[in-house]
Amino acid sequence: MDAVTINSFFMIGALLIGISVLLSPVSSKLGIPILLVFLAVGMLAGEDGIGQIAFDNYPVAYLVSNLALAIILLDGGMRTRVASFRVAFWPSVSLATLGVAVTTLLTGLLAMWLFNLSLLQGVLVGAIVGSTDAAAVFSLLKGRSLNERVGATLEIESGTNDPMAVFLTVTLIAVLGSAETNLSAGFLLLSFIQQFGVGALLGLAGGWILWWLINRNQLPEGLYSILAVSGGLMIFALSNALGGSGILSIYLTGLLLGNRPTRSRHAILNVLDGMTWLAQIGMFLVLGLLVTPSELMEIALPGLALAVGMILFARPIAVWIGLAPFKSFTAREKWFVSWVGLRGAVPIILAVFPMMAGLPNAQLYFNLAFFVVMVSLVVQGGTLTKAMSLAKVELPPKPEPISRTGVEIYPTSEWELFIYKLKADKWCIGEPLRNLFMPEGTRIAAVFRDNQLLHPSGSTELCEGDTLCVMAQERDLESLSRLFSEAPEKASLARFFGDFFLDIEAKLQDVALLYGLDLGELEADAKLKDLVLEHLGETPVLGDYFEWHGLQWVVADVVDWKVTKIGLRLPPEEELQEGAE
């Protein structure tokens, strides 16, 4: 490769990345996933597009995709709170194992019928497209106010279900590639334990060693993120080399780093944010270049039937079977989890395996995987907002600061600087700072007014448009945001959480007298928390509700996984009038 070729490679690569970045706002305007934009740019630059770039180097595509996926999962793991495992761990594990297996089998049977394949070949197609994609799920759910049980389940499932798909794909390729491979129960069990066991062990052990190294060594600030990424990639590669799941390993590594007091954690996350965007762009550009759109047209109708069958038939059945033991999930939540079974880069990466193994029909598998991913991103990704509304799993947006920055004043500092812009509707306008009910240990470090820095004191009165810089920790975020952020409209909050709020310790007898409810003797002696336990179980989340005595009772506040307030939704005025008559 000469200097001119290398320079051309840099120019074309930079141009495609720049175009992808500049076109990213188009996704929100058109209501389509941003990943689809990156994929489309790659396809337009390919051999059937205006770029006429002929790219069919599957090993390079495999390398780029795995590198990108590893970085995305490291970032996703660091941003996942272990606390969410309380409500989502076992449902996620069930979906990541049993759910993937059921989806694989049902999709495989459909593929066998549609494309005249053998049973094993059809199930291989099902295994390739059987898992949800972490890059797609993390990207599309980012910034969404979802019911925590649903949101955490989807994110943890997407970060942990790839090992099952890899296990099934690799096993089936081994069987199809060699008649001597013994597909016995012992072989399958050993392969399964190796994928998950080695992956989990190396992820946790390697993650702990990496965390120790980061905290132990005094390095320039910019090197901690490089150490975190290089260490994560080493764990990813070592796990793969030992027959484990590198995908699971690096996700668990990120989970450990993000949930322990890690030196320069905020700086690492800031760097990872940019690297994750670059990884997503690069991965989908390369995968877009790899496909030949004219070949997709040859399988368009049966490919569409396969994708629709998986979305409307295989995935919902798998979700309902996988979540059957978990009574806390409502039918609406199960349907939403079914719908957000987004496919992305992972199925396309898995479809490269048969190409590299030289299996018959390998090109068909690849084209099918690509087609299914495109349909999934367009149909499921494009209707995500509508699905959230129909399933009623979306919460009112939480008040947030306009910016937040980590303050690394000591190695494992949890301090952050939160920036707030005061709006006219805030009660603190005109109040001196000494009158604010600030969380204990927090402090307003600076106030900016008309682009001028003020030195705040207890007598400083706040004005509309002031910008406040507040020193605090993440645990203080909710209280501070209630004080200073632009809050959602009261009408929308009332529609969601109810017209009145009741303390969880309130006696049902008092509630009955207040709202004219007819209670039996046993109910009259109970408290509101007993009613919540009876209807919602031990781990309700914000936004859960139940019907009782013709009223809707909504979980309106949760602190440390304990319900503290219940919202009461009254029937519409017309129903109240009819009842009075």
Swiss-Prot record:
<keyword id="KW-0633">Potassium transport</keyword>
<dbReference type="InterPro" id="IPR005170">
    <property type="entry name" value="Transptr-assoc_dom"/>
</dbReference>
<dbReference type="GO" id="GO:0005886">
    <property type="term" value="C:plasma membrane"/>
</dbReference>
<dbReference type="InterPro" id="IPR038770">
    <property type="entry name" value="Na+/solute_symporter_sf"/>
</dbReference>
<keyword id="KW-1003">Cell membrane</keyword>
<dbReference type="Pfam" id="PF00999">
    <property type="entry name" value="Na_H_Exchanger"/>
</dbReference>
<dbReference type="InterPro" id="IPR036721">
    <property type="entry name" value="RCK_C_sf"/>
</dbReference>
<keyword id="KW-0813">Transport</keyword>
<keyword id="KW-1133">Transmembrane helix</keyword>
<feature type="transmembrane region" description="Helical">
    <location>
        <begin position="304"/>
        <end position="324"/>
    </location>
</feature>
<feature type="transmembrane region" description="Helical">
    <location>
        <begin position="3"/>
        <end position="23"/>
    </location>
</feature>
<dbReference type="Pfam" id="PF02080">
    <property type="entry name" value="TrkA_C"/>
</dbReference>
<dbReference type="InterPro" id="IPR036318">
    <property type="entry name" value="FAD-bd_PCMH-like_sf"/>
</dbReference>
<comment type="function">
    <text>K(+)/H(+) antiporter that extrudes potassium in exchange for external protons and maintains the internal concentration of potassium under toxic levels.</text>
</comment>
<feature type="transmembrane region" description="Helical">
    <location>
        <begin position="87"/>
        <end position="107"/>
    </location>
</feature>
<dbReference type="GO" id="GO:0015386">
    <property type="term" value="F:potassium:proton antiporter activity"/>
</dbReference>
<feature type="transmembrane region" description="Helical">
    <location>
        <begin position="271"/>
        <end position="291"/>
    </location>
</feature>
<dbReference type="InterPro" id="IPR006037">
    <property type="entry name" value="RCK_C"/>
</dbReference>
<dbReference type="InterPro" id="IPR023729">
    <property type="entry name" value="NhaP2"/>
</dbReference>
<protein>
    <recommendedName>
        <fullName>K(+)/H(+) antiporter NhaP2</fullName>
    </recommendedName>
</protein>
<feature type="transmembrane region" description="Helical">
    <location>
        <begin position="30"/>
        <end position="50"/>
    </location>
</feature>
<keyword id="KW-0406">Ion transport</keyword>
<dbReference type="InterPro" id="IPR006153">
    <property type="entry name" value="Cation/H_exchanger_TM"/>
</dbReference>
<feature type="transmembrane region" description="Helical">
    <location>
        <begin position="109"/>
        <end position="129"/>
    </location>
</feature>
<feature type="transmembrane region" description="Helical">
    <location>
        <begin position="232"/>
        <end position="252"/>
    </location>
</feature>
<keyword id="KW-0812">Transmembrane</keyword>
<dbReference type="Pfam" id="PF03471">
    <property type="entry name" value="CorC_HlyC"/>
</dbReference>
<feature type="transmembrane region" description="Helical">
    <location>
        <begin position="58"/>
        <end position="78"/>
    </location>
</feature>
<feature type="transmembrane region" description="Helical">
    <location>
        <begin position="335"/>
        <end position="355"/>
    </location>
</feature>
<keyword id="KW-0997">Cell inner membrane</keyword>
<dbReference type="GO" id="GO:0006884">
    <property type="term" value="P:cell volume homeostasis"/>
</dbReference>
<comment type="similarity">
    <text>Belongs to the monovalent cation:proton antiporter 1 (CPA1) transporter (TC 2.A.36) family. NhaP2 subfamily.</text>
</comment>
<keyword id="KW-0472">Membrane</keyword>
<dbReference type="GO" id="GO:0050660">
    <property type="term" value="F:flavin adenine dinucleotide binding"/>
</dbReference>
<feature type="transmembrane region" description="Helical">
    <location>
        <begin position="364"/>
        <end position="384"/>
    </location>
</feature>
<dbReference type="GO" id="GO:0030007">
    <property type="term" value="P:intracellular potassium ion homeostasis"/>
</dbReference>
<keyword id="KW-0630">Potassium</keyword>
<keyword id="KW-0050">Antiport</keyword>
<feature type="domain" description="RCK C-terminal">
    <location>
        <begin position="405"/>
        <end position="486"/>
    </location>
</feature>
<feature type="transmembrane region" description="Helical">
    <location>
        <begin position="192"/>
        <end position="212"/>
    </location>
</feature>
